[in-house]
Amino acid sequence: MIDKRDFKAFKLVSKYAPSGDQPQAIEALVDNIESGEKAQILLGATGTGKTYTMSQVISKVNKPTLVIAHNKTLAGQLYGEFKEFFPENAVEYFVSYYDYYQPEAYVPSSDTYIEKDSSVNDEIDKLRHSATSSLLERNDVIVVASVSCIYGLGSPKEYADSAVSLRPGQEISRDQLLNALVDIQFERNDIDFQRGRFRVRGDVVEVFPASRDEHAFRIEFFGDEIDRIREIESLTGKVLGDADHLVLFPATHFVTNDEHMEQSISKIQAELADQLKLFEAEGKLLEAQRLRQRTEYDIEMLREMGYTNGVENYSRHMDGRSAGEPPYTLLDFFPEDFLIMIDESHMTMGQIKGMYNGDKARKQMLVDYGFRLPSALDNRPLRREEFESHVHQIVYVSATPGDYEMEQTDTIVEQIIRPTGLLDPEVEVRPSMGQMDDLLGEINLRVERGERTFITTLTKKMAEDLTDYLKEMGVKVKYMHSDIKTLERTEIIRDLRLGVFDVLIGINLLREGIDVPEVSLVAILDADKEGFLRNERGLIQTIGRAARNADGHVIMYADRMTDSMQRAIDETARRRAIQMAYNEEHGIIPQTIKKDIRDLISISRAVEAKATEAETNYESMTRSERQEAIKQLQKNMQEAAELLDFELAAQLRDLILELKAID
């Protein structure tokens, strides 16, 4: 039995008090939540301190909160900020634990079957276990997640019911505890003590929970009774203190007992028989043979080991769900009245909508060709309407809310005024004729003042040509293309801020972490070419890149005024007028943001190495050259898998294995 701790309030720690229009935004959001409003939008301009406002709301409504971001990097940044705001509460991080993941796939055109291949990040796996155990043990929990939170996770009831609860004085023999640990997927290893393992020394059992990375527990027995439970350092064995209660959650999120396993296997066998009849009736004998061989092997593994590769494909039977019923996800671990906050909702909600269809298309091919049973289709992410069914109360947070959010609610809380008094930049439109010379003059003005420039183009060729032209003109310039990885991008931004170069050119400068206070000019080329990066939302987001500098200015180069341009200019002017009126009333003089220049530390502690171009004659390489080539190939393999080019990813994987075999 899990004793959930007494309700503990969120305690926000910050040296700042709410300012600008943060106080009215916080009050409005809290009032709406407390009055039972299901959905609302926080329309916060860039740099107005939306994360701080979110933290204030969480601390005042005191509900377990799920914050969803649209990628790992952004989730990592938010996790760090919330940890600083709530040092005494449980702030957790839940993203995909795969460093590399190539899903199982079949390509009929070339009759190519590609097995699932992945590498798991142990640090992130630990953080995921920490998130689920915190949700079951306490109320003061904030989980910052990517859209991985809508993927299947296993039953929270099975997970909670399987937990082993221990107290000093409890009657339980050492062997009973060992059996209980094995049942919840802990592994005995008396030599290599790691997460999810235990070791035994006489009447002492040491257990390393899956949710910890440095601290383990020592359980000391006196006969068939627990004498004492101590928290220890896993590496040195140093005693940190006594514990009066210890709850050990399963070492994996997918757990089941023997009785349940036999029931699941019976259902798998029944489904196999039905599908074999169907294939044989259609004359698909190869598919029938393939399915029988594979499924019977998996059943044997489940009986003997309690596990098989791809066990998640049988999750419908394991969970006791009906066909088509949604899987259990992280959302099921929360209590019913929890709060959801969607960061950058204009991006995140689109991702949530698209996950299901992409997953189904790939799995349907595996089912049609006899690689998987039809029930594998129920190991999937939630549909958007299924996600909506989990929503008790939700806050969409964005500078440019999407159509979906606007359809969900009319309740919009604006946060336009920045605590620094900074204004939205002035925007002007200039003709594209002679834009290069005009732009060069504007850049030189900024260089003289020690300021920086962003230029956004629509095509790779234009970005490259412009980079070459500016270099010839003596401008220190860099082009940031889409192939650059997160940490390399951070290095480029740092160099721009330090003045190593003065101009950054890119196609999509809306990525996270590209807010640079030193940038006073943003130039938008081909502003009149309607599309993703030149629609109203894209333009407003791009304009916002100049909003962290007191002299922020935006120039759109265009031959005509599109509706998107006009709406973006009008909205920016509206916000600027509100900000100017506030500054005048309160005697505030806008000051450029002072922001420390520091390197980003990845949440997973992984360092992305710069890889050299791989040569084709691998055997003539030195060992270190081969290692560099392997890193580059792994990067290419991951990108191929993300683009669903499974054949190329499989070829690269095989090449990596060959290279590793040389050494």
Curated annotation (Swiss-Prot):
It is found in: Cytoplasm. Its main location: cytoplasm. GO terms for molecular function: ATP binding; ATP hydrolysis activity; DNA binding; excinuclease ABC activity; helicase activity. Keywords: ATP-binding, Cytoplasm, DNA damage, DNA excision, DNA repair, Excision nuclease, Helicase, Hydrolase, Nucleotide-binding, SOS response. Residues 435-601 form the Helicase C-terminal domain. It holds the Pfam family ResIII. Gene3D superfamilies: P-loop containing nucleotide triphosphate hydrolases, UVR domain. GO terms for cellular component: cytoplasm; excinuclease repair complex. CDD domains: DEXHc_UvrB, SF2_C_UvrB. SMART domains: DEXDc, HELICc. ATP binds at G44, A45, T46, G47, T48, G49, K50, T51. Belongs to the UvrB family. The beta-hairpin motif is involved in DNA binding. The UvrABC repair system catalyzes the recognition and processing of DNA lesions. A damage recognition complex composed of 2 UvrA and 2 UvrB subunits scans DNA for abnormalities. Upon binding of the UvrA(2)B(2) complex to a putative damaged site, the DNA wraps around one UvrB monomer. DNA wrap is dependent on ATP binding by UvrB and probably causes local melting of the DNA helix, facilitating insertion of UvrB beta-hairpin between the DNA strands. Then UvrB probes one DNA strand for the presence of a lesion. NCBIfam families: PRK05298.1 (NF003673), uvrb (TIGR00631). This is UvrABC system protein B. The lineage of its organism: Bacteria, Bacillati, Bacillota, Bacilli, Lactobacillales.
